[in-house]
Amino acid sequence: MEPPGADTVVVRYGDMSTKSSRVRRGMEKRLVENIEALLADRGIDGDVERRPTRPLVWTDEPTAAAEAAADAFGVVSTSTARTMPADPDPILDAMAETATAHYDGGSFAVNARRAGDSFPMDSEDLGREGGQAIWEAVEDEFEPEVDLDDPDFTVNVEVREDTAFLYLDQISGPGGLPLGTQRPVVALVSGGIDSPVAAYE
């Protein structure tokens, strides 16, 4: 599910973050190349930007690009996201607009995170203000309720340096390390299905 105005795909990796900075840089480069190859193979226009811990795909086809990037080994998950300046007003406006477009009743929550101290609000305050913005946007049509444990609808916001990313869902990827960064291995495959499945795992 895309937030209104989605213009990018946030790509998350896991195992790569445990590597040294030198090794991680090489793996990030290979991951970007692999994502670019997947996009090209599926005819999806997009520019892949290499960023620490969060590669980005800038595209006019965010859902298709998110699904393609999620097929790359090394990727833990992807999300279609709307970007905006790391300023409270546009973030809160985007939360309200997203709720107006996609919230259809039931409980909701805001999951807000920030990296660094330059943003003027902490994560808890941003979540509280965002919840208020969503409530005011939908209260005339629905009877909203907040449920932080098991909400029916969640708006996620990550604030990183000078940019904020708003997203709704995550597409799971295979995880692991990028294809082409490890030495080849041999898998003994018998006639059944268990062997290739075990080799993949």
Give the location of each predicted region.
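Short glycine/serine/threonine-rich phosphate/pyrophosphate-binding segments
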Residues: 194-199
